[in-house]
Amino acid sequence: MLDLKLLQNNFDEIAQKLKAKKVDENLLKELSDLFINLKKEKALLEEFQAFQNKFSKELATAQDKESLKAQLSQNKEKINAQSKIVNELEEKLGQIALAIPNTPDDCVPFGEDEDENVELKKVLTPPSFDFEIKEHHDLGEKLNWLDFTRGVKISQSRFCVLKNEGALLSRALVNYMIDFNRSRGFELVNVPFLVNGATMYGTGQLPKFKDDMYKVENDDLYLISTSEIPVTNLYSNEILTQEELPLKMTCYSACFRQEAGSAGKDTRGIIRQHQFEKVELVSICKPDQSELMFEEMLNCASDLLSSLGLAHRHLMLCTGDLGFSAAKTVDLEVWLPSQNKYREISSVSNCKDFQARRAKIRFKNDKGKNELVHTLNGSSLAVGRTLVAIMENYQEKDGNIRIPDVLRKYF
């Protein structure tokens, strides 16, 4: 959530940044009108309260006490009625504020959509092949690693069963990713895959992405779409010490997404699934630590890809493609030979104090005052897409797939 006082005092400037993030202008107009109306109604309430305070003190020495008592009684009714008006406006403002995204950092390039994202650098050279390459789903079915038919039978479309060496490779990747992240100083945590609504609000999934969530019927529980949600919220409504920061955590989880609006995209294979696995990085830190932490997390995920021998690139997201809670995001895209292009495999985001304000995560600063932390998150890595990348980049002419050297000890 944005700082509403800052938004009110700098509305035009912040509104321009929000427009760059495709916030509906009608919503911004409603927000502006609310600020104006709330300011007017608060001023009237303060006027009534000032009258009450002043003349309550004078009641004992007043010459016409009964008349003043009557005036104070009437004024008390005005205060109650006006307080109700102010409370209703503040509640409405709070609801609208939950639907307003984070503002982009000044370093984020302006752009309408993913076509205007900016490539920062490429890492490693994509492999060349002297034979006709196959797509991962064809390789997987031939090797009996991927069973799409039975996945659909027991669930529905966008579900797959991993088998044999495919399942072993997936498990090896999870273990390797966790070990790699831990070697970089990230503490391993294991969290529930079902969380309550307050937790979803804390990191910004609700109310904006309600249609993309799987909700448990007749219960206030949701399946997580990323372990960023429970891990960040581990510290909701807490005040941390400076000595505890930065917190660096890594977490494996299954993730669940309805993929609303993704009809027709990546319908074959396991690139876009309703259920997938991911190893996440999450950091909670002081504001003056967040830029260094962003670079540390980005380097961790990029170095992990490099250790697997996978060519990839760093892509700075433009304002129009930036996520709801993020102030800045760099995507890592891995090379897929069958598509002859790079595909997203990780997003590293700095959310600044946006999630911390929603989740009420604070620390005691040097002046002894409570200050909001900064939160960051990033995939290190998406397991299914890493599996896809290895299958395609390590395929051989006979249809077999070599296992990267760093993974062999996990088999």
Swiss-Prot record:
GO molecular-function term, one example from the UniProt record: ATP binding
GO biological process: one example: selenocysteine biosynthetic process
Pathway, per record: Aminoacyl-tRNA biosynthesis; selenocysteinyl-tRNA(Sec) biosynthesis; L-seryl-tRNA(Sec) from L-serine and tRNA(Sec): step 1/1
Protein residues bound to ATP: R257, Q258, E259, E344, I345, S346, S347
EC number: 6.1.1.11
Source species, domain of life: Bacteria
Record localization: Cytoplasm
Annotated positions binding L-serine: T226, S227, E228, E280, S379
TM stretches of this protein: none
Record keywords: Aminoacyl-tRNA synthetase, ATP-binding, Cytoplasm, Ligase, Nucleotide-binding, Protein biosynthesis
UniProt cross-references to HAMAP family, sorted A to Z: Ser_tRNA_synth_type1 (MF_00176)
The protein's assembly and partners: Homodimer. The tRNA molecule binds across the dimer.
Family designation: Belongs to the class-II aminoacyl-tRNA synthetase family. Type-1 seryl-tRNA synthetase subfamily.
Its biological purpose: Catalyzes the attachment of serine to tRNA(Ser). Is also able to aminoacylate tRNA(Sec) with serine, to form the misacylated tRNA L-seryl-tRNA(Sec), which will be further converted into selenocysteinyl-tRNA(Sec).
UniProt protein name: Serine--tRNA ligase
